[in-house]
């Protein structure tokens, strides 16, 4: 049982994913990282079969890195989403499909706009202002629909995420622990939901909360 959320605001994207890993009714890990940084302003939250998710996330990350090395700049969110969708669509038509659902979020530095994409294992892609995968779909989309609006600031986005998490914990029998990141023009930062004001914490400690992300190399063959 997994759960992930994505929320866009005026100039940011928030991605959150649970940290549980298990099979059937058995939980094997409670610190699994299901968020993968793909670039300085691009990340995804993934869920699905354990082996498929790890292999697919690594495959996507390495190919994004290869694009950086070849072209000296990162792949922008619209192009990245198209390539990820095509990869899943081709895989499901092969003998080795990926049972992976994901939320791809990023900030386009050329247009200064946030992007969020809902993608499933069938290769279906939708551009959305907010989204969820897993068990959270059944109880949180109505909360997002009620409280979301286009020009939400970062603090309001975190508050909406907390509403979704609270609703999920209230309606479901399983308690989830969440890993959360925020993507904006300044890069990717970890959101500590245990803090009273996570956004103020990011502003006060930008380096401590920054998530390490691959950057374009200076020269071909030289890593950043």
UniProtKB/Swiss-Prot annotation:
Its main location: cytoplasm. InterPro entries: Ntn_hydrolases_N (IPR029055), Proteasome_beta2 (IPR035206), Proteasome_bsu_CS (IPR016050), Proteasome_sua/b (IPR001353), Proteasome_suB-type (IPR023333). GO terms for molecular function: endopeptidase activator activity. The keyword ATP-binding does not apply. One of its GO terms (cellular component) is nucleus. It comes from Cryptococcus neoformans var. neoformans serotype D (strain JEC21 / ATCC MYA-565). It is found in: Cytoplasm; Nucleus. Keywords: Cytoplasm, Nucleus, Proteasome. Signal peptide: none annotated. Non-catalytic component of the proteasome, a multicatalytic proteinase complex which is characterized by its ability to cleave peptides with Arg, Phe, Tyr, Leu, and Glu adjacent to the leaving group at neutral or slightly basic pH. The proteasome has an ATP-dependent proteolytic activity. The 26S proteasome consists of a 20S proteasome core and two 19S regulatory subunits. The 20S proteasome core is composed of 28 subunits that are arranged in four stacked rings, resulting in a barrel-shaped structure. The two end rings are each formed by seven alpha subunits, and the two central rings are each formed by seven beta subunits. The catalytic chamber with the active sites is on the inside of the barrel. This is Probable proteasome subunit beta type-4. The keyword Disulfide bond does not apply. It holds the Pfam family Proteasome. The lineage of its organism: Eukaryota, Fungi, Dikarya, Basidiomycota, Agaricomycotina. One of its GO terms (biological process) is proteasomal ubiquitin-independent protein catabolic process. Belongs to the peptidase T1B family.
